[in-house]
Amino acid sequence: MYLADYHTHSRISPDGKFTMAQMAQAALDKGFQEICFTDHVEPINWGETTLCPLPYNWEPLRREFAAAQAEMGDQITMRLGIELDAMFDIGHTMQVLQGAPEFDFVIGSVHMLSREKMGGLDLYFFQPENEEQAHAGIRDYLDQVRQFAQWDGSYSVLGHLTLPLRYLNELRGFHLTFDDYEKEVEEIFRSLIERGRGIEVNTNRGNDPLPGEKWLRMYRDLGGEIITLGSDAHNTANIGCAIRQRQELLKKCGFEKFCTFEKMVPIWHKL
């Protein structure tokens, strides 16, 4: 079994705490052969809805990865990626990416509700009073994901498709699903597949995977092949969490292989 964690956050992310070297050592200690660092790159200022200043400062990321390479050597394969927030202004996003390092892998993720309809609220802070409001948030989120899936920019996979469920169910006490949105999810998958993009299975640090079995089967039935696995770890304790179990889930859903990436090109591994 080839073990690779393709969604991790180091101290370069505002919500990360550990060095890349510490994260890589944790992965190595848990029997992993590969880790990809996917620190947040957000075209808006963290915790706000205002656009970040330009040019974007890539030097902290470059230095951190170089230090990890120097410390870890060839003990474990390390890839440099980012989690790019799919935000309101694609033009600004393209400017943010100017001067970026050469990435191996890019996750495209939506973390916020629309600025026009929902005030640009981060999903983490979304506190609907009832299911009607919660579903309004889900619809808004899926509309943003739909738009992003039609973007022809440079990214590898769509991150944690069913992310609102992490917050609505795990934090707010709802018991919601995406079952009412099959048409919307299918459209998103078709857009990704047509453009040669994939999805991730976000193990959600051992909680319900994002997305779950129903949607993984739909993606596979539509012809989707490109798929990665990542823990979304923001600390060393969660590195690699539930990756083994989610590999088994992929096999159950009919997948025979999964991807890692090098210089934005998928490398296939048998499940």
Predicted features and spans:
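Hydrophobic faces of well-ordered beta-strands that scaffold small-molecule active sites
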Residues: 4-8, 35-37, 78-82, 106-108, ...
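Short acidic/histidine-rich active-site segments
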Residues: 40, 161, 224-241, 260-261
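Extended substrate/RNA-proximal surfaces in nucleic-acid metabolism proteins
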Residues: 51, 55-194
